[in-house]
């Protein structure tokens, strides 16, 4: 005889919300998460069961099991765990891009983390002058450090470099012309374009020269009664090679000053130290740019500087004063946590010989290929044992990049692990599985392989990394 099909569940058989809340099995969850939260999750669970009943996907025995105490607790635990994953998650960045915009850019040094914790957990003298017992300036400490480190007359800070450019242009060039080389009208991530920012700031863009060649005469001939300033935008996220010509900062400054105009330089990534001293390609520093005659320089805090997201403007005191008087300055200001972190990072630059030890960004960028290759050798066997038989894993030389638009042509000799698969789609499946680990692992797929660049994997994190990797066996 054929066994009878299970009786389809009826919506009328669903228990009431109040009855479920009174179940002894749920008491611990209610105590740990609150009645309101558990009530919300139960409503969602009951609606899911109601939908399955309407679709004919649930039998009476299945419904009875779904609302039984242990099964209900398991379902609520799973829902709570899923909600917890909505938080920002720590990840292992094995992409080979150090300052990865999508992964949060620069990691903060211990000094900055401690400073942020203090600012978060106690009242601080954010805008209070302790000596005089009255209101103070929230930017004062950062301004003093920036001036000390760069030689600038004054400085101010906002919450990112795009905001710095917007504020600067709105303060100095509203309804007036800004002269820029056509080859420097950059677009960075998220379709942020210099011409659009100028328009939003109320400035009128006057582009000169051509994409590949701009000469001093192009700037001289463009200056008129409506000109507010000359602007140089550092081409940090692309390169132009071949038949090219560019007016350097000193020459642009001379032209601007001859006509009584300021020269503004957007350095983008910005650096306060010579990267060549760490074995990296040279990047114009803020100090060099100011010494070349720039009146204002703006740059990011969370890129080569190695700090929190910030936009720093340094230069002439009279121009900084005009910027600070703009009502937009308050709308774009940094919060106390960002200021605390930035102050701590800038303070590290007072002892440049120790930067590579203390600043994660420089420590990571300056790692030797031999160091990473030794790390790959240590990880090879335990990682290989966790992979299925149709995957192959081997050590391999690689090339890292700085990221976040810094030195796009620079290739940093690196090392890591290269995974290939005998099955079609195997690499995509493995990459997805790695992203689903409790602490996701992100590499890059290229040339029929999954590349895991070890530049950003600190030796101190190897045990935690292997613990995640071993979960692939589950």
Stretches with model-predicted labels:
Residues 87-88, 154-155, 299, 439-444:
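A short linear hydrophobic-aromatic micro-motif
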Residues 1-80:
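Long amphipathic alpha-helical segments
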Residues 369, 373-458, 464-465:
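Conserved C-terminal alpha-helix-loop-beta "cap" of PLP-dependent enzymes
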Residues 14-15, 33, 92-96, 305-308, ...:
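Short Gly/Ser/Thr- and Asp/Glu-enriched loop/turn motifs at secondary-structure junctions
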Residues 318, 326-327, 334-387, 396-399, ...:
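Structural motif of enzymes handling amino- and sulfur-group chemistry
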Residues 133-349, 468:
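Conserved PLP-enzyme active-site core in the AAT-like
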Residues 94-95, 105-131:
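Glycine-rich phosphate-binding segment of PLP-dependent enzymes
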């Amino acid at each position: 005889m054929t066994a009878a099909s299970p009786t389809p569940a009826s919506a009328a058989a669903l228990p009431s919300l109040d009855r479920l809340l009174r179940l002894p099995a749920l008491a611990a969850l209610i105590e740990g998460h609150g009645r309101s939260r558990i009530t919300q999750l139960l409503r969602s669970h009951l609606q899911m069961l109601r939908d399955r009943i309407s679709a004919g996907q649930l039998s009476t025995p299945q419904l009875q099991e779904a609302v039984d105490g242990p099964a209900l607790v398991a379902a609520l635990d799973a829902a709570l765990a899923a909600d917890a994953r909505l938080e920002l998650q720590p990840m292992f960045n094995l992409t080979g891009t150090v300052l990865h915009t999508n992964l949060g850019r620069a990691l903060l040094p211990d000094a900055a983390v401690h400073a942020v914790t203090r600012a978060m957990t106690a009242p601080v003298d954010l805008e209070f002058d302790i000596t005089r017992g009255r209101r103070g300036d929230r930017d004062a400490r950062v301004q003093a450090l920036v001036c000390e480190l760069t030689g600038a007359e004054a400085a101010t800070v906002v919450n990112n470099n795009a905001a710095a450019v917007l504020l600067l242009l709105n303060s100095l060039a509203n309804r007036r012309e800004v002269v820029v080389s056509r080859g420097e009208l950059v677009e960075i991530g998220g379709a942020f374009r210099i011409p659009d920012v100028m328009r939003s700031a109320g400035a009128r863009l006057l582009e000169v020269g051509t994409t590949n060649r701009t000469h001093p005469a192009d700037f001289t001939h463009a200056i008129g009664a409506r000109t507010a300033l000359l602007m140089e935008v550092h081409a940090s996220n692309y390169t132009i090679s071949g038949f090219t010509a560019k007016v350097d900062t000193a020459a642009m400054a001379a032209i601007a000053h001859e006509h009584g105009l300021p020269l503004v330089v957007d350095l983008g990534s910005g650096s306060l130290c010579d990267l060549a001293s760490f074995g990296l390609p040279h990047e114009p520093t803020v100090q060099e740019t100011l010494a070349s005659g720039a009146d204002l320089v703006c740059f990011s805090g969370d890129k080569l500087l190695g700090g929190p997201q910030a936009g720093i403007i340094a230069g002439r005191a009279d121009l900084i004063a005009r910027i600070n008087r703009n009502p937009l300055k308050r709308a774009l200001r940094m919060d106390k946590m960002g200021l605390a972190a930035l102050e701590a990072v800038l303070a590290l630059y007072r002892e440049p010989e120790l930067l590579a030890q203390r600043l994660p960004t420089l420590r990571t960028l300056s790692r030797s290929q031999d160091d990473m290759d030794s790390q790959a050798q240590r990880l090879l066997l335990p990682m290989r044992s966790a992979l299925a038989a149709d995957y192959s894993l081997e050590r391999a030389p690689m090339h890292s990049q700085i990221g976040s638009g810094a030195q796009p042509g620079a290739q940093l000799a690196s090392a890591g692990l290269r995974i290939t698969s005998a099955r079609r789609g195997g690499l995509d499946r493995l990459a997805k599985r790695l992203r689903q680990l409790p602490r996701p692992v992100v590499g890059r797929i290229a040339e029929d392989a999954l590349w895991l660049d070890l530049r950003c994997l600190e030796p101190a994190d190897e045990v935690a990394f292997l613990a995640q990797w071993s979960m692939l066996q589950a």
